[in-house]
């Protein structure tokens, strides 16, 4: 059952990485073509009637501003450029009939959208490489840590890009409304952007879970291998034998006479009693042993 759950979770992470990569690609190609469904992907749409060099409606996409005529046709080929800002002043090179907030907050619109453009590309690079390497982790577990690191950077840049672009689009919508012009956010584009952020969060959590679990499993396996190695019988290992304490007793003339008087001349004394008496004696170590010599009293050895 555990293996089944592992396979299911791996497939979920793989599916989320693939979906996240696809969402980022769809956002990046918005504005690159006039065909359906890509022409439905835009950040914000506003009424630009009366602004020179602009159409009746203008949609700001990832690559630039798409002009929409009254018949509903889109023209996205004339105003395309990398890091195209949501700024009618810079897009149409005019201040005439441009909403006032686009003029007073020109720098904010300019830098928010340009930085988000760069961050989206960086996020796509990290997420895309993470997706490719995660497929290879099924064959080699050495790439798991690298996938986690790359996905962490992808999560940070993707979230930053979506936050910056959402802020710029909301400010643009409010600027059109303050000038009594109609404007709306692109629901499809915003949905894909925040869906990619959600997928990044889920992917990051799952990858951290897998990394921590792999570390714990490796540590547990190492401990078990050490235990098994130490518990095996080694023919070249010899356990130390416990040395018995020597029992030394002092023997002298008086002791010999006392023992002789106790035992007596009879040779049929009970050896068990003598052994028990010997065991009951207090054990200790006497450093001096005196031996009696019949030849000379001076031959006493220490």
From Swiss-Prot:
Regions that span the bilayer: 11-31, 115-135, 146-166, 190-210
UniProt organism field: Saccharomyces cerevisiae (strain ATCC 204508 / S288c) (Baker's yeast)
Miscellaneous section: Present with 17000 molecules/cell in log phase SD medium.
Similarity comment: Belongs to the SUR7 family.
Chief place where the protein resides: membrane
Name of the protein in question: Protein SUR7
Keyword Cell membrane: yes
Matches recorded under Pfam families: SUR7
Biological role stated in the UniProt entry: Involved in sporulation and affects the sphingolipid composition of the plasma membrane. Probably involved in endocytosis.
Keyword entries, A-Z: Cell membrane, Endocytosis, Glycoprotein, Membrane, Phosphoprotein, Sporulation, Transmembrane, Transmembrane helix
């Amino acid at each position: 059952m555990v293996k089944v759950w592992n396979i299911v979770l791996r497939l979920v992470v793989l599916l989320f990485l693939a979906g996240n990569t696809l969402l980022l690609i769809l956002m990046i190609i918005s504005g690159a073509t006039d065909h359906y469904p890509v022409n439905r992907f835009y950040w914000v749409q506003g009424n630009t009637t009366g602004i020179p060099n602009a159409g009746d409606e203008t949609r700001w996409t990832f690559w630039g501003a798409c002009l929409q005529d009254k018949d509903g046709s889109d023209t996205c080929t004339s105003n395309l450029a990398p890091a195209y800002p949501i700024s009618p002043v810079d897009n149409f090179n005019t201040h005439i009939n441009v909403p006032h907030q686009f003029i007073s907050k020109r720098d904010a619109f300019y830098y928010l959208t340009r930085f988000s453009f760069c961050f989206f590309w960086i996020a796509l690079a990290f997420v895309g490489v993470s997706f490719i390497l995660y497929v290879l982790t099924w064959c080699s577990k050495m790439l798991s840590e690298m996938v986690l690191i790359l996905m962490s950077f992808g999560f940070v840049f993707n979230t930053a890009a979506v936050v910056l672009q959402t802020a710029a689009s909301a400010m643009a919508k409010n600027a059109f409304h303050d000038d009594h012009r109609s404007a709306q956010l692109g629901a499809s584009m915003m949905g894909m952007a925040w869906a990619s952020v959600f997928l990044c969060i889920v992917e990051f959590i799952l990858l951290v879970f897998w990394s921590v679990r792999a570390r714990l499993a490796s540590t547990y396996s190492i401990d078990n291998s050490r235990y098994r190695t130490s518990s095996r019988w080694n023919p070249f290992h010899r356990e130390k034998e416990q040395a018995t304490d020597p029992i030394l007793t002092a023997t002298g003339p008086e002791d010999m006479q006392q023992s002789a008087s106790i035992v007596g001349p009879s040779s049929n004394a009970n050896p068990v009693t003598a052994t028990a008496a010997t065991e009951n004696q207090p054990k200790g170590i006497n450093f001096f042993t005196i031996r009696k010599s019949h030849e000379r009293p001076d031959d006493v050895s220490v």
